[in-house]
């Protein structure tokens, strides 16, 4: 089974927050882009065999989950509803 890498960088940190808040509304920012790219590279290496890349998919899902939870938490602390 493929390894998702030992890098477990927090997706929503001060640097990411500043980038996210400073971007225009039409600009897309995904702090989990690196994890997404690793999963796509795994698919290419393994001729599209998703079972070989399940660790990478799980790492991406976990990254997105952490990112969304941290954003919600910061919005709650700031008193923003949306």
Curated annotation (Swiss-Prot):
Residue ranges annotated as motif Cx9C motif 2: 53-63
**Quick one: where's region Disordered?**
1-27
Name its cellular compartments. Answer: Mitochondrion intermembrane space
One GO BP on record is:
mitochondrial respiratory chain complex assembly
Write out the GO cellular component annotations: mitochondrial intermembrane space; mitochondrion
Motif Cx9C motif 1: list the residue ranges: 32-42
> What InterPro entries does the annotation carry?
COX23, Cys_alpha_HP_mot_SF
Q: List the disulfide bonds.
A: 32-63, 42-53
Tell me where it mainly resides: mitochondrion
Protein name per Swiss-Prot or TrEMBL: Cytochrome c oxidase-assembly factor cox-23, mitochondrial
Q: What is the lineage of its organism?
A: Eukaryota, Fungi, Dikarya, Ascomycota, Pezizomycotina
């Amino acid at each position: 089974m493929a390894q998702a890498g030992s890098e477990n960088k927090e997706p929503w940190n001060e640097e990411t927050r500043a980038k996210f808040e400073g971007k225009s509304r039409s600009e897309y920012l995904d702090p989990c882009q690196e994890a997404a790219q690793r999963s796509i590279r795994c698919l290419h290496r393994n001729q599209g065999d998703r079972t070989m890349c399940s660790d990478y998919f799980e790492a991406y899902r976990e990254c997105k989950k952490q990112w969304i939870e941290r954003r919600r938490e910061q919005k709650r602390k700031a008193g923003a509803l949306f």
